[in-house]
């Protein structure tokens, strides 16, 4: 009998966290929740703690921690509440933990994810920003600690499944010619360009295929999400940006493909449900039931493909430029995007201005080497300052 694995879920109240807990609950003989973390949805975090009875919960502030601790005691639970980034790093690196779901959105997830890496944990990486920001430093830490890094993004998990087991030897050595990264095209794939000036946050968050959080939904609408995934794919699979091609596939059934030098193209298909890649990574190299319905090809009937329109999706072009520039450029791209998307969700800017802000930040700030984590955070901070200056200068 295999020992029950202890799982920390960073970002438990988000869509990835909830899907992870759904899969875990289906396999109580295999997995137990060690820690859950939340940011603003404290009532939801309390409910999850009552259901899963973790040893630890983490919230950002002491006042929230005190309230949650009192509520947990009232519910008869022994769950201990920790606070802030230090608490996140503690539950990510605790000796008892076997695997960490890294699902905190944005730059805030970098330090706790790195703490899990440095502790040699099995990392289920949903926080693409951590790898986008720190790139080489992150992968060096993985290599040094012996941590197992498994991608959760449906596209990267699909690529992982289509790659040979020894892909780390180098793509050319294992016969891989290119990676084909699929994208749905989001809710604005066919919206007339002149109407994009007037789209609302609600429209941007109404993804046709996937159920996601607000920030990643906007990123999907702008295809910045695909740009970040392009950068992530380069690091995960040691690929050059020129080896990663983005293909718009509206049905979101083929999650990505790998093109081999002999003419073979391997693809991974499935219903658009994040429980599939989560279950794949949780159980790897085994397979477990995810709760996802079988794929009905007859109901789908057709699969369409087209090239992305860079006039419609300038964020994708900016992300590829950052990938090619390397060094501090991806961290600046990510930071500027986080500020811009937040401003759009707050109705302070129009949708096309997301790309305008990012473009200005990348144009104004020179690319510098990032040989240590402090340099990554310095680039992140500088980009945020420049993005805020754009907002102030334009009266937003």
From Swiss-Prot:
Keywords: Isoprene biosynthesis, Manganese, Metal-binding, NADP, Oxidoreductase. Mn(2+) binds at residues 153, 155, 229. Its cofactor is Mg(2+); Mn(2+). Gene3D superfamilies: 1.10.1740.10, NAD(P)-binding Rossmann-like Domain. 1-deoxy-D-xylulose 5-phosphate binds at residues 128, 154-155, 184, 207, 220, 225-226, 229. Transmembrane segments: none annotated. GO terms for biological process: isopentenyl diphosphate biosynthetic process, methylerythritol 4-phosphate pathway involved in terpenoid biosynthetic process. It catalyses: 2-C-methyl-D-erythritol 4-phosphate + NADP(+) = 1-deoxy-D-xylulose 5-phosphate + NADPH + H(+). Its EC number is 1.1.1.267. Pathway: Isoprenoid biosynthesis; isopentenyl diphosphate biosynthesis via DXP pathway; isopentenyl diphosphate from 1-deoxy-D-xylulose 5-phosphate: step 1/6. NADPH binds at residues 13-16, 127, 129, 213. Signal peptide: none annotated. It comes from the Bacteria. GO terms for molecular function: 1-deoxy-D-xylulose-5-phosphate reductoisomerase activity; manganese ion binding; NADPH binding. It is an enzyme of class 1 (oxidoreductase). The keyword NADP applies. InterPro entries: DXP_reductoisomerase, DXP_reductoisomerase_C, DXP_reductoisomerase_N, DXPR_C, DXPR_C_sf, NAD(P)-bd_dom_sf. NCBIfam families: Dxr, PRK05447.1-1, PRK12464.1. Catalyzes the NADPH-dependent rearrangement and reduction of 1-deoxy-D-xylulose-5-phosphate (DXP) to 2-C-methyl-D-erythritol 4-phosphate (MEP). Belongs to the DXR family. This is 1-deoxy-D-xylulose 5-phosphate reductoisomerase. It comes from Pseudomonas fluorescens (strain ATCC BAA-477 / NRRL B-23932 / Pf-5).
């Amino acid at each position: 009998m295999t020992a029950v694995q202890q799982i920390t879920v960073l970002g438990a109240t988000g869509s990835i966290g909830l899907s992870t807990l759904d899969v875990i609950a289906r396999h109580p003989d295999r997995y137990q929740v060690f820690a859950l973390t939340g940011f603003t949805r404290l009532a939801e975090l309390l409910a999850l703690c009552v259901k899963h009875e973790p040893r630890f919960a983490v919230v950002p502030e002491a006042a929230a921690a005190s309230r949650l601790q009192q509520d947990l005691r009232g519910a008869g639970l022994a769950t201990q509440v920790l606070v802030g980034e230090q608490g996140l790093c503690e539950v990510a690196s605790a000796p008892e933990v076997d695997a960490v779901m890294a699902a905190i959105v944005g730059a805030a997830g970098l330090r706790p994810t790195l703490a899990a890496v440095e502790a040699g944990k099995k990392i289920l990486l949903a926080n693409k920003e951590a790898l986008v920001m720190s790139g080489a430093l992150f992968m060096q830490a993985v290599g040094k600690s012996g941590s197992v890094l498994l991608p959760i993004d449906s596209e990267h998990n699909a690529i992982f499944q289509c790659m040979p087991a020894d892909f780390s030897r180098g793509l050319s050595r294992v016969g891989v010619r290119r990676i084909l990264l699929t994208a749905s095209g989001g809710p604005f794939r066919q919206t007339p360009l002149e109407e994009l000036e007037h789209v609302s946050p609600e429209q941007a968050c109404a993804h046709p295929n996937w159920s996601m959080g607000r920030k990643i939904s906007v990123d999907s609408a702008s295809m910045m999400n695909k740009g970040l995934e392009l950068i992530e794919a380069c690091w995960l699979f040691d690929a050059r940006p020129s080896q990663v091609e983005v293909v718009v596939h509206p049905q979101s059934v083929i999650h990505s493909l790998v093109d081999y030098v002999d003419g073979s193209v391997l693809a991974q298909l499935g219903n658009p449900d994040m429980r599939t890649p989560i279950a794949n990574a949780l159980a790897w190299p085994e397979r477990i039931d995810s709760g996802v319905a079988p794929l009905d090809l007859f109901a789908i009937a057709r699969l369409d493909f087209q090239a992305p329109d860079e006039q419609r999706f300038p964020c994708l072009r900016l992300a590829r430029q950052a990938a090619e520039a390397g060094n501090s450029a991806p961290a600046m791209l990510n930071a500027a995007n986080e500020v811009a998307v937040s401003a759009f969700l707050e109705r302070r800017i129009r949708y096309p201005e997301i790309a305008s802000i990012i473009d200005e930040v990348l144009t104004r700030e020179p690319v510098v080497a990032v040989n240590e984590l402090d340099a990554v955070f310095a680039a992140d901070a500088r980009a945020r300052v420049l993005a805020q200056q754009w907002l102030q200068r334009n009266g937003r």
